[in-house]
Design a protein with these regions (language model features):
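Surface-exposed, charge/polar-rich loops and edge strands
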Residues: 30, 41-456
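Structured catalytic/translocation cores of nucleotide/phosphate-coupled proteins
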Residues: 3, 22, 39-41
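Acidic, Ala/Val/Gly-enriched low-complexity intrinsically disordered segments
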Residues: 2, 6, 11-14, 28, ...
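Cationic, low-complexity basic patches in intrinsically disordered or flexible, solvent-exposed regions
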Residues: 12, 19-22, 27, 34, ...
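Residues at the start of alpha-helices and the adjacent loop-to-helix junctions
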Residues: 1-2, 279
Length: 456
């Protein structure tokens, strides 16, 4: 990775005394009146808003940011993490995937793994060194991938508001994944990777972000995958806090397990705390919040290892009950309700027939649901994609070429490419309190871990 910062940030970073005004934050939090309608699961109060909070980040100096930053822990396996961190002792993967520094046979959820995470974290703090911002702040984080650019606000969000559904969800979580990240947070007493949130865009916030990016950045580097990462410290965070009070709801785009783990860690730390006030750092979780019109969702494709005992002819007969099937089709769908299917060396196009289409505006109308309800479950016998070992998921950037490779090499019998889920679908499903099928969305570019750490 290439750094474009000429100077190292001083170890002690001093901010304007204006930030001390934010001591009043907890008073604002306490003054808001909130009641929950348990029958409908909806919030009722005089003013519905989601509040953001500045925090004193633990972070690398500017000229080390590119070395420290790592991809999210959950998008790579141990072997990939070990390869990425090779010959780079500052890579945050030594903290987020500490098993890479232990023998191959190590149980990923055993005590030695979490001990190694703590040891590596303390070593990184000393060797990098990581610096603690003296005063709470808010940051802007810009990612550029090719022609795509998005910029979001880095701040902490309230776990109370997560619990109360002011921060809305669209995905179920798995207990085993929660267990892992909860323990990781408690051992480190830190949240090291942000939750990816979104909101319905605001012209006021867009203008404020544009003004902030005119100043010098604290981080500016290009990662090995050619994605540019730039972070600015906001000089007047109170303006952003006030602006977000006009935003009714925040939505989890990616990071449901991180958010759920932060809530569980808070419950445990609250239990251990004497004189809990609700203003402790463990009551908030680290997030990057992007406007919905900048977020890029890519397809999350599927590959199946067999045809569930069916012959090719029987399989096609099953498909024709719901789809028009075209041979020599496209590898990438052009619209909703259309699917690419690679089977026996050829691409086919599946187009959902009108008489088989579910009602619009529901979870069942999503393409991931249509594929599940019309093909995977009734024809191929995949009833639970969360646990069935016969299905693999191919996200985002790997595209149709990866699907073709899996089938051509005999690692899959058939593969399906999907049209990407739309952001409006995600917001609508979240607003309705519904749950999307697993692996419905793949977001690119990916945020990096280790750049701005929230200590709890």
């Amino acid at each position: 990775m290439v750094s474009r910062l000429a100077k190292t940030t001083p170890e002690r970073i001093v901010f304007s005394n204006k930030l001390l005004q934010f001591i009043n934050f907890k008073q604002a939090m306490r003054s808001r009146k909130l009641s929950v309608d348990n029958r409908r699961g909806q919030l009722r109060r005089e003013e519905i808003v989601a509040v953001i909070r500045p925090f004193s980040a633990l972070r690398p100096p500017g000229d080390r940011a590119g070395e420290v930053a790592s991809v999210p822990y959950d998008v790579i396996n141990t072997e990939e993490a070990r390869a990425l961190a090779a010959n780079n002792p500052l890579s945050f993967l030594h903290v987020s995937r500490p098993e890479i520094d232990l023998p191959d046979a190590t149980d990923l959820h055993s005590d030695p793994v979490y001990r190694k995470a703590f040891e590596n974290f303390e070593k990184l703090i000393k060797d990098c060194p990581l610096l603690t911002e003296e005063a709470p702040s808010i940051y802007l984080y810009r990612l550029i991938m090719g022609d795509h650019e998005q910029i979001g606000v880095v701040a902490c969000c309230s776990i109370d508001e997560y619990d109360q559904d002011l921060i809305r969800k669209h995905e179920r979580t798995r207990r085993d994944k929660e267990d892992d990240r909860t323990r990781h947070m408690l051992v480190l007493r830190a949240q090291t990777g942000p939750v990816f949130l979104t909101y319905r865009s605001s012209r006021e916030i867009d203008t404020m972000m544009m003004e902030t990016t005119m100043a010098n950045a604290i981080f500016d580097f290009t990662a090995a995958d050619s994605i540019e990462h730039t972070i600015w410290r906001v000089p007047d965070p109170v303006r952003f806090v006030h602006a977000f009070r006009e935003i009714p709801f925040l939505y989890i785009a990616d990071g449901h397990h991180r958010a759920a783990s932060a809530a569980r860690a808070r419950a445990e730390l609250k239990e251990q705390s004497f004189g809990h006030t609700g203003d402790e750092e463990y009551n908030f979780f680290l997030a990057v919040i992007f406007p919905d019109d900048q977020v890029q969702i890519l397809a999350y494709n599927r590959a199946l290892r067999d045809l569930n005992g069916l012959s090719t002819g029987e399989f096609f007969e099953g498909l024709k009950k719901s789809f028009d099937v075209k041979e020599d089709g496209v590898d990438t769908p052009k619209r909703r309700g259309q699917f690419g299917m690679y089977l026996e060396g050829r691409w086919h196009t599946l187009s959902l027939r009108a008489d088989a289409a579910p009602p619009q505006g529901t979870v069942t109308s999503l393409d991931v649901s249509i594929l599940q309800d019309r093909v995977l479950a009734p024809i191929l016998g995949i009833n639970d994609v969360r646990t069935d070992k016969r299905i693999d998921f191919v996200g985002g950037m790997r595209g149709s070429k990866e699907l073709k490779r899996l089938v051509d090499e005999g690692k899959a019998a058939v593969a399906f490419s999907l049209y990407p889920t739309m952001m409006q679908d995600l917001l609508s499903v979240s607003d309705a309190g519904e749950i999307m099928p697993p692996k419905s969305t793949w977001f690119e570019p990916k945020l990096r871990d280790g750049l701005l750490i929230h200590r709890i």
